Amino acid sequence: MNSSSKNAVVYWGTGRRKTSVARVRLIPGTGKITINGRPGDHYLNFNPAYLSAVKAPLHTLGLGEAYDVLVNVYGGGLTGQSDAIKQGAARALCELSVDNRKPLKTEGHLSRDPRAKERRKYGLKKARKAPQFSKR
């Protein structure tokens, strides 16, 4: 790492979805995405839905190639992780400028998705699945 990259301005954001937590850093650069030390497309298995979710906040503001995205993410699966990264990137972009908040909010990138796995209840097989009923 050279001295110019050490002095570069870094914007932080944290995102969550299901059981996933992502810590996102935005650094002025060329639009490269690195997730847990691996290239973003490799980490997300080249899945276009996951890749577009990660890039969505940057494309909303027209900054797709302006910042490098460095991510540490843990917990959950790829769906939860990609949406957590999306929210973390959006929050980091709000740190960049206050004017970025309104377009990101209207697109829904700043809102936390509250859906999570429902707990299993006693007397049932799963969260809502009852055991087979026998009349006789």
From Swiss-Prot:
GO MF annotation list: RNA binding; structural constituent of ribosome
GO biological process assignments: translation
UniProt region (Disordered), positions on chain: 103-136
Compositional bias ranges of the Basic and acidic residues kind: 103-116
Record field: compositional bias (Basic residues): 117-136
SUPFAM superfamilies (UniProt xref): Ribosomal protein S5 domain 2-like
GO CC terms in record: cytosolic small ribosomal subunit
InterPro entries in UniProt: Ribosomal_Su5_D2-typ_SF, Ribosomal_uS9, Ribosomal_uS9_bac/plastid, Ribosomal_uS9_CS, Ribsml_uS5_D2-typ_fold_subgr
Family listed: Belongs to the universal ribosomal protein uS9 family.
Protein name, entry field: Small ribosomal subunit protein uS9
Species whose genome carries this gene: Prochlorococcus marinus (strain SARG / CCMP1375 / SS120)
Organism classification: Bacteria, Bacillati, Cyanobacteriota, Cyanophyceae, Synechococcales
